[in-house]
């Protein structure tokens, strides 16, 4: 029996940061710092697969904090994510990293929800920052990107944009910040039949 394309129906938002004085080339911040950020985000025991940024309407109202679903996580499972994540080195002049994910929902001409889109944001800073700076920068750039997603498709905004962000002031040699949406439950669209 054929199955149609798969789409998520439950998601969670999460984030984490990590830092280390140790690392392996060619991207030393990917090794220890990334693992620490995954641990803080509570997704360290998944096999992470990145998505692009289109959200089915079934996710509207079904995006929860990671703490609501962590007890259901399966060690070694595949986790499909939309993730903003980057590392940096203080040796190269970066002393803070901010990451964020934003979500917009669109409606058709009758006001019916058609689905959504996500945008990812990463910014490096030459000095330490605080949460107010991290949040304001994330919202500013994500708002611009989300509005572009709607304008590109000539779609009207259905509801308020949603924003999630994280940041790190790097105190060691390397640092990493990530913000992510993870997808847990799925359904299948009707299979396609070509006649």
From Swiss-Prot:
The record marks 52-53 as: Cleavage (non-hydrolytic). Its cofactor is pyruvate. GO terms for molecular function: arginine decarboxylase activity. Its EC number is 4.1.1.19. It catalyses: L-arginine + H(+) = agmatine + CO2. The modification Pyruvic acid (Ser) is found at residue 53. Its main location: cytoplasm. Gene3D superfamilies: Pyruvoyl-Dependent Histidine Decarboxylase, subunit B. GO terms for cellular component: cytoplasm. Keywords: Cytoplasm, Decarboxylase, Lyase, Pyruvate, Virulence. It is found in: Cytoplasm. Trimer of an alpha-beta dimer. Belongs to the pyruvoyl-dependent arginine decarboxylase family. This is Pyruvoyl-dependent arginine decarboxylase AaxB. It comes from Chlamydia abortus (strain DSM 27085 / S26/3).
């Amino acid at each position: 029996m054929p199955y149609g394309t798969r789409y998520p129906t439950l998601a969670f938002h999460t984030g984490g940061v990590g830092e280390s004085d140790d690392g392996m080339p060619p991207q030393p911040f990917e090794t220890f710092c990334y693992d620490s950020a995954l641990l803080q985000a509570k997704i360290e025991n998944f096999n992470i697969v990145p998505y692009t940024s289109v959200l089915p309407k079934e996710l509207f109202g079904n995006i929860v904090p990671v703490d609501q679903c962590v007890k259901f996580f399966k060690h070694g499972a595949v986790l499909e994510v939309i993730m903003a994540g980057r590392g940096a080195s203080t040796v190269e002049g970066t002393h803070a990293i901010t990451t964020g994910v934003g979500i917009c929902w669109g409606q058709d001409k009758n006001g019916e929800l058609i689905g959504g889109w996500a945008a990812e944001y990463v910014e490096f800073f030459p000095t330490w920052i605080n949460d107010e700076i991290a949040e304001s920068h994330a919202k500013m750039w994500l708002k611009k990107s989300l509005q572009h997603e709607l304008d590109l498709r000539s779609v009207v905004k259905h509801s308020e944009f949603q924003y999630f962000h994280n940041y790190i002031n790097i105190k060691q040699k390397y640092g990493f910040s990530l913000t992510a949406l993870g997808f847990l439950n799925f359904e299948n669209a009707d299979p396609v039949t070509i006649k």
